[in-house]
Amino acid sequence: MSDTPYYTDQVLRAAACYWEEKDADNVKLEKAELQARIEAYILANNTCALATGTGDYVRCTPIEYSYHDGCFWMFSEGGKKFVGLAKNPQVCLAIYDTYEGFGKLHGLQVMGRAELVEPFSERYNAHAAFQKIPLSALQKLS
């Protein structure tokens, strides 16, 4: 075994750029077509892995979502994801298919800023109505 670590900064930078370089010569979809395909994929699913974190603490939580008005919406009664959300609104979520072989996996990663909506506010209640979730059911989670 070598005294020199394999994972040098150069090796890690090359790994981080792998897909950009591999896909550089591929034909790209028009922006409107790409957006339509992305939204269709998002709407065809309802569960994601939501990553939150702060400092050395990270958490990745499977959670149900809905998508409308260009935003992901999630209801949660609590959990460790709020440790990160309390100090850092930056999040990442991943939606993906069951693995059926190399080159056949479909998925999507989204990075953005989480916004906590106050329970039973007008926006909260509107989303509950959109999801057809009775407020009485959500009150039991509080």
Where is each model-derived feature located?
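Short N-terminal helix-initiation segments at or just after the protein's N-terminus
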Residues: 6-15, 34-38, 51-60, 89-98, ...
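Short, solvent-exposed aromatic-acidic interface loops
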Residues: 77-80, 130-131
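Short, basic/aromatic recognition patches
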Residues: 26-47
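Alpha-helix boundary recognition
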Residues: 42-43, 83-87
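Short, surface-exposed beta-strand-loop junctions and turns on beta-sheet-rich folds
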Residues: 80-83, 100
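Short beta-strand segments
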Residues: 45-78, 93-97
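Active-site-adjacent structural patch at catalytic or cofactor/ligand-binding sites
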Residues: 77, 87-98, 106-115
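Charged, gly/pro-rich active-site loop segments
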Residues: 1-30, 105-142
